[in-house]
Amino acid sequence: MLQQAQTTSRNTLLDRVDSPKDIRQLTHDDLIILAAEIREKIIDTVSKTGGHLAPSLGVVELTLALHYVFNTPTDKLVWDVGHQSYAHKILTGRRKQFDTLRQYRGMSGFPKRGESDYDAFETGHSSTSISAALGMTLAMDLLQQDNKAIAVIGDGSMTAGMAFEALNHAGHLDKNLIVILNDNEMSISPNVGALSSFLSRKLTGKTMRRVKSHLVEKLQDSDVGENILNVLRKSEESFKSFFTPGMLFEAFKFDYIGPIDGHDIDALISTLNTVRDTAKGPALIHVLTKKGKGYLPAEENPDAFHGVGPFNRQTGKIIKKKGPASYTTVFGQTMLELGKKNKNIVAISAAMVAGTGLTPFSEAYPDRFFDVGIAEQHAITFAAGLASQGMRPVVAIYSSFYQRAMDQIIHDVCIPNLPVTLAIDRAGVVGDDGPTHHGIFDISFLRFIPNLTIMAPKDEAELQQMLVTATGHDGPTAIRYPRGAGEDVSTSQEIESIPILEIGRGELLREGDDILLLPIGNRVYPAMRAAEELAKQGISASVINPRFIKPLDAELICQQAKKTGRIITIEDNTLCSGFGSAVLELLSQKSLYGIKTKILGHPHAFVEHGPQKTLWENSGITSRGIIMAALDLLQKETDPSVANE
């Protein structure tokens, strides 16, 4: 059950909308007013909770028109990525809960089937909507149900190959699938690539007449040309299709309609009604929208307001917490310095330039920076190609998005043992975006790959060391680091002063006799604090910073394991096949069967959204959780409140 926020009653149109049935009774003027009230609700809420503001503001009229025309939830709406679904949530019975958006145990920021029948398909990653809606369309056809499935996909998501695989299949099946192309010329960062340039070709009437006149003149010079002209004269639209985006989608056997003003409710409703009632086969409606529509700061800087924390709604100024630099910032600064020292280093992003900290590198070395769009598979193999010719590519992608490129990592990078560095940002739980964005599987799905070295820094200084080590290593490497601030340790501004790490060598931070704490990455400092508290209770703990998930420092770990007879591993990753599993495998290989062990990490489940600290506490990987696990392993009791994260 969602928490229901306490809200003050207001006499607005929005207060009278509890389901899409209510908006179908409204007049044109009412819909205009309602759109403004929805924007007000979204801006007011997101300014407090944070969230995906600009994408949701851009599709308010489109959302109203879709629910006005289609019989949802019987007709199925599939929102690609899902970060633009706020108006959809407000209109489908969740208005009173909207103030709990992205709050712990509150409303998800993405479509959730368990949250509402109107959320037909769960999304969070890009480019899945057309495939899902096509599957729904086929299922309805097989079940003899006369309903529609509508995919709403942004032009940014159309840069991914999966979208075109679905278009190709849909054209072959020739079913009544409806695709809405929400074209705002943005994914998160501004769109890149030939497709984006193609979609942006909107010829004026004057330009069209000039092109047509010139083409007619040339074609009239031959019999073949005259035959072509006869065909073109049959339809002005056919002529225009040579020069507009429609030709691309018509090649996939879609009926193309558009471009249409995505903020003109009348035009949207009229077009959707026509397509719903007359389409025979797949149809694509090209809708032009403005990301951030209705809130000037978001319109002027849609990248900054794509996914935003709390902000001052009057000024648009983002409320930033004071504290240490983030791991992402340190990564970006170090990449900038590495690029200065080594001309063979190139950086690759998948439509997340600012999010991965690569903006400074992209500005300083534009010829060595590549934003490939939402195309993680291509990013990895593109990097492999660069590496095969002597370059040192660093690919910066969020942990949860690396899942999309598993085959490329294995087949194109690790089998040929190429020097590609995988910078795994947002490793571990990320907070309010929830299970589609948590990075709690990367240790598990990367650890089994031969040739791949995997590292995790305990702090921002060690991140620098690992990045320098990785870019100089003759083989594939991965560095996983978390979302958020570092440990406020000093970092180096000079690459030459950053030490290169010995592959597979950890460090003994504290030596004890009773128990070995073996944390990885961002769990090292909580483990050190736990060891200090345990010492106050007479328990002597060793603490190792492994640095390397693969290969493990077998000598150091086994030496301390034999000495203490007890091990607790701690990781910001799922328990299944993670770092703890690797340690157990090591003990088995070394025939150390008498060691008592306890593995701490996230459960074998999809972790819901919530503050990072809360999620760490729930999984027992804070200082307090480590202390409790140690006492349990030692079969002692004490006050559990002795330490907190």
Curated annotation (Swiss-Prot):
<keyword id="KW-0786">Thiamine pyrophosphate</keyword>
<keyword id="KW-0460">Magnesium</keyword>
<dbReference type="Pfam" id="PF13292">
    <property type="entry name" value="DXP_synthase_N"/>
</dbReference>
<dbReference type="GO" id="GO:0016114">
    <property type="term" value="P:terpenoid biosynthetic process"/>
</dbReference>
<feature type="binding site">
    <location>
        <position position="155"/>
    </location>
    <ligand>
        <name>Mg(2+)</name>
    </ligand>
</feature>
<dbReference type="InterPro" id="IPR049557">
    <property type="entry name" value="Transketolase_CS"/>
</dbReference>
<dbReference type="GO" id="GO:0030976">
    <property type="term" value="F:thiamine pyrophosphate binding"/>
</dbReference>
<feature type="binding site">
    <location>
        <position position="295"/>
    </location>
    <ligand>
        <name>thiamine diphosphate</name>
    </ligand>
</feature>
<feature type="binding site">
    <location>
        <position position="184"/>
    </location>
    <ligand>
        <name>thiamine diphosphate</name>
    </ligand>
</feature>
<dbReference type="GO" id="GO:0019288">
    <property type="term" value="P:isopentenyl diphosphate biosynthetic process, methylerythritol 4-phosphate pathway"/>
</dbReference>
<dbReference type="GO" id="GO:0000287">
    <property type="term" value="F:magnesium ion binding"/>
</dbReference>
<dbReference type="InterPro" id="IPR029061">
    <property type="entry name" value="THDP-binding"/>
</dbReference>
<dbReference type="InterPro" id="IPR033248">
    <property type="entry name" value="Transketolase_C"/>
</dbReference>
<feature type="binding site">
    <location>
        <position position="184"/>
    </location>
    <ligand>
        <name>Mg(2+)</name>
    </ligand>
</feature>
<dbReference type="Pfam" id="PF02780">
    <property type="entry name" value="Transketolase_C"/>
</dbReference>
<feature type="binding site">
    <location>
        <begin position="124"/>
        <end position="126"/>
    </location>
    <ligand>
        <name>thiamine diphosphate</name>
    </ligand>
</feature>
<keyword id="KW-0414">Isoprene biosynthesis</keyword>
<dbReference type="InterPro" id="IPR009014">
    <property type="entry name" value="Transketo_C/PFOR_II"/>
</dbReference>
<keyword id="KW-0808">Transferase</keyword>
<feature type="binding site">
    <location>
        <begin position="156"/>
        <end position="157"/>
    </location>
    <ligand>
        <name>thiamine diphosphate</name>
    </ligand>
</feature>
<dbReference type="InterPro" id="IPR020826">
    <property type="entry name" value="Transketolase_BS"/>
</dbReference>
<dbReference type="GO" id="GO:0008661">
    <property type="term" value="F:1-deoxy-D-xylulose-5-phosphate synthase activity"/>
</dbReference>
<dbReference type="GO" id="GO:0052865">
    <property type="term" value="P:1-deoxy-D-xylulose 5-phosphate biosynthetic process"/>
</dbReference>
<comment type="function">
    <text>Catalyzes the acyloin condensation reaction between C atoms 2 and 3 of pyruvate and glyceraldehyde 3-phosphate to yield 1-deoxy-D-xylulose-5-phosphate (DXP).</text>
</comment>
<dbReference type="GO" id="GO:0005829">
    <property type="term" value="C:cytosol"/>
</dbReference>
<protein>
    <recommendedName>
        <fullName>1-deoxy-D-xylulose-5-phosphate synthase</fullName>
        <ecNumber>2.2.1.7</ecNumber>
    </recommendedName>
</protein>
<feature type="binding site">
    <location>
        <position position="376"/>
    </location>
    <ligand>
        <name>thiamine diphosphate</name>
    </ligand>
</feature>
<feature type="binding site">
    <location>
        <position position="83"/>
    </location>
    <ligand>
        <name>thiamine diphosphate</name>
    </ligand>
</feature>
<keyword id="KW-0479">Metal-binding</keyword>
<comment type="pathway">
    <text>Metabolic intermediate biosynthesis; 1-deoxy-D-xylulose 5-phosphate biosynthesis; 1-deoxy-D-xylulose 5-phosphate from D-glyceraldehyde 3-phosphate and pyruvate: step 1/1.</text>
</comment>
<dbReference type="InterPro" id="IPR005477">
    <property type="entry name" value="Dxylulose-5-P_synthase"/>
</dbReference>
<dbReference type="InterPro" id="IPR005475">
    <property type="entry name" value="Transketolase-like_Pyr-bd"/>
</dbReference>
<dbReference type="Pfam" id="PF02779">
    <property type="entry name" value="Transket_pyr"/>
</dbReference>
<comment type="similarity">
    <text>Belongs to the transketolase family. DXPS subfamily.</text>
</comment>
<keyword id="KW-0784">Thiamine biosynthesis</keyword>
<comment type="subunit">
    <text>Homodimer.</text>
</comment>
<dbReference type="GO" id="GO:0009228">
    <property type="term" value="P:thiamine biosynthetic process"/>
</dbReference>
